[in-house]
């Protein structure tokens, strides 16, 4: 790695990125810091991620996202991260780290770029390449050496305490030790590290045939499609007497996922600022969840349930369908000599009073709670259930229906009473335990034995089975498209389908083709 000049050395600012989840790799960090890395005239001087572990702090500091004010503590902190020291880096995180996290020492050019990087990413949530939130936050802090902060590196005089506390030369972490860290010495093919090297550098290496293919796979490099650079279209037009409104800069990943701010979100393992979990739960309860099914029927949802396509956006209005009929004069009729769909649906909706009824006096809680609602609401649901049973839309089998729901409250009471009176498992009943210890099996007895428990009577012998008549018509060839879609299923008792679903259709089961399907059905003699 080339030795930088003095001017560049003065402009270099070192920072520590801590709180990195161990599951993240360099490819994920490239996607996370892509917006800052690909900026023209900016970016990282070096960001080479090497999965350096860090220790969890004993106590969390309240404002650790800010720059620490004790430079001596930072120098002592970085002294633990030398290449010869195997102890992990100890950082002060704002959240109690429960999982293993890592850190990395990076460098940027100039104090302005360092402040911009801290403002963009420090305190934000971690995201992977798929946009999934990860526990913890990104914490970026400026790294200052003790000599750099005090400016008294060559001061010859020392205090009595400094003279008494002897320290070896190899224990003092200097700028030379900082430059020897593996994070600040990336390989030649990645001059700014596996995270900080922009895509244009890899493109130049590809043009020069110097980039191995494995680096593209490891870093998951995705190059933009070739096209015009749009040098003139990217220049904004400045209007006269225009005022620019400063807005908060949004940060995005390489996949276009927005990285949310970390000051208003609660961490997954624990709350960041020591807030009790009850307050966080109250804030979640105060949020409006109008799309949930259990919202007890607000005004707009109630209006939507009573009227079809209230906004006119679903385009469910009936199209004109003409069919000649024999017209019968009827009072209040349309007088048309042909049958229309609109006329049929208008008759289904009822008269004017029924169409304009708001039903505000109907208790809608019966649709959410089985035992809720007043008597009128429960009777309405019962009438709807009976109508569906008559139409065959509801399964009215008594066998499959659960019998004895009261056993949920009474099951096990008899056993508790007997155990209280001294009964144990495997003993008979009575004071002498002379009863049968086990209950009788309900399997019955031998089928040829015609008396006693388990005899069901004579078995009816059928004299003749009726043959199924053959179909005279040709068979209907079904296709996979005949199967109804999930949104076209029949309505349930307490919920209705959206107005876009198909209400009337002939259900035809799809039968996959076989060798027997090619044979044409033979006509009866």
From Swiss-Prot:
Pfam families: G-patch
Region Disordered: start-end pairs: 264-316
Domain annotation G-patch: ranges: 410-458
GO biological process: negative regulation of RIG-I signaling pathway; negative regulation of type I interferon production; positive regulation of DNA-templated transcription
Subcellular location: Nucleus; Cytoplasm
One Gene Ontology molecular-function label: nucleic acid binding
Alphabetic keyword roster: Cytoplasm, Disease variant, Glaucoma, Nucleus, Transcription, Transcription regulation
Tissue: Expressed in ocular tissues including retinal pigment epithelium, cornea, ciliary muscle and non-pigmented ciliary epithelium. Also expressed in optic nerve, cartilage, skin and lymph node.
Primary subcellular site in the record, as a coarse category: nucleus
Compositional bias per record (Acidic residues), positions renumbered to this chain: 275-298
GO CC term (a single one): cytoplasm
Highest taxon of source: Eukaryota
Outcome of mutating residue 23 to M: Found in a patient with primary congenital glaucoma; uncertain significance
Residue ranges with Basic and acidic residues bias: 299-316
Clinical condition linked: GPATCH3 variants may be involved in the pathogenesis of congenital glaucoma, an ocular disease characterized by marked increase of intraocular pressure at birth or early childhood, large ocular globes (buphthalmos) and corneal edema. It results from developmental defects of the trabecular meshwork and anterior chamber angle of the eye that prevent adequate drainage of aqueous humor.
Reported function: Involved in transcriptional regulation. It is able to activate transcription from the CXCR4 promoter and therefore it might control neural crest cell migration involved in ocular and craniofacial development. Is a negative regulator of immune antiviral response, acting via down-regulation of RIG-I-like receptors signaling and inhibition of type I interferon production. The control mechanism involves interaction with mitochondrial MAVS and inhibition of MAVS assembly with downstream proteins implicated in antiviral response, such as TBK1 and TRAF6.
Oligomeric and partner information: Interacts with mitochondrial MAVS; the interaction is markedly increased upon viral infection.
Protein name (Swiss-Prot/TrEMBL): G patch domain-containing protein 3
Species of the source: Homo sapiens (Human)
């Amino acid at each position: 790695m080339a030795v930088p000049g003095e001017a560049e050395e003065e402009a270099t600012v070192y920072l520590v990125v801590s709180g990195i989840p161990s599951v993240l790799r360099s490819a994920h960090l490239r996607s996370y810091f892509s917006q800052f890395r690909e900026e023209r005239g900016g970016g990282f001087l070096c960001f080479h991620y090497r999965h350096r572990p860090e220790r969890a702090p004993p106590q969390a500091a309240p404002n650790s996202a800010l720059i620490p004010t004790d430079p001596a503590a930072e120098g002592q902190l970085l002294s633990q991260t030398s290449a010869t020291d195997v102890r992990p880096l100890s950082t002060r995180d704002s959240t109690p780290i429960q999982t293993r996290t890592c850190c990395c020492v990076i460098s940027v050019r100039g104090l302005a770029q360092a402040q911009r990087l801290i403002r963009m990413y420090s305190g934000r949530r971690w995201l992977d390449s798929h946009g999934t939130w990860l526990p913890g936050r990104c914490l970026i802090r400026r790294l200052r050496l003790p000599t750099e902060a005090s400016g008294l590196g060559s001061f010859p005089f020392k205090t009595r305490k400094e003279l008494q506390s002897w320290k070896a030369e190899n224990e003092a972490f200097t700028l030379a030790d900082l430059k020897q860290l593996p994070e600040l010495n990336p390989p030649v093919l990645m001059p700014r590290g596996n995270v900080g090297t922009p895509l244009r550098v890899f493109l130049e290496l590809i043009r020069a045939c110097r980039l191995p293919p494995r680096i593209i796979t490891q870093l998951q490099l995705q190059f933009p499609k070739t096209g015009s650079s749009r040098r003139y279209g990217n220049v904004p037009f400045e209007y006269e007497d225009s005022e620019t409104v400063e807005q908060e800069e949004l940060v995005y990943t390489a996949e276009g996922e927005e990285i949310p701010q970390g000051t208003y979100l609660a961490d997954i393992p624990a709350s960041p600022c020591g807030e009790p979990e009850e307050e966080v739960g109250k804030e979640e309860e105060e949020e409006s969840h109008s799309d949930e099914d259990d919202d007890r029927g607000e005004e707009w949802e109630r209006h939507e349930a009573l009227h079809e396509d209230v906004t006119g956006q679903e385009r469910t209005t009936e199209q004109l369908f003409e069919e000649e009929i024999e017209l019968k004069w009827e009072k209040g009729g349309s007088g048309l000599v042909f049958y229309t769909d609109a006329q049929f649906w208008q008759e289904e909706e009822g008269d004017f009073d029924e169409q304009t009824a708001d039903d505000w006096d109907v208790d809608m809680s019966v649709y959410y709670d089985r035992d809720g609602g007043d008597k009128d609401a429960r009777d309405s649901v019962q009438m709807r259930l009976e109508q569906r049973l008559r139409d065959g839309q509801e399964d009215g089998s008594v066998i499959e229906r659960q019998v004895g729901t009261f056993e949920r409250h009474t099951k096990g009471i008899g056993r508790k009473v007997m155990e209280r009176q001294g009964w144990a498992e495997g003993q008979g009943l009575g004071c002498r335990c002379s009863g049968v210890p086990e209950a009788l099996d309900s399997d019955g007895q031998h089928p040829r034995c015609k008396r006693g428990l388990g005899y069901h009577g004579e078995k009816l012998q059928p004299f003749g089975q009726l043959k199924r008549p053959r179909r005279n018509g040709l068979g209907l060839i079904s296709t996979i498209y005949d199967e109804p879609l999930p949104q076209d299923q029949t309505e349930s008792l307490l919920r209705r389908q959206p107005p876009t679903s198909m209400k009337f259709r002939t259900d035809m089961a799809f039968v996959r083709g076989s060798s027997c399907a090619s044979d044409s059905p033979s006509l009866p003699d």
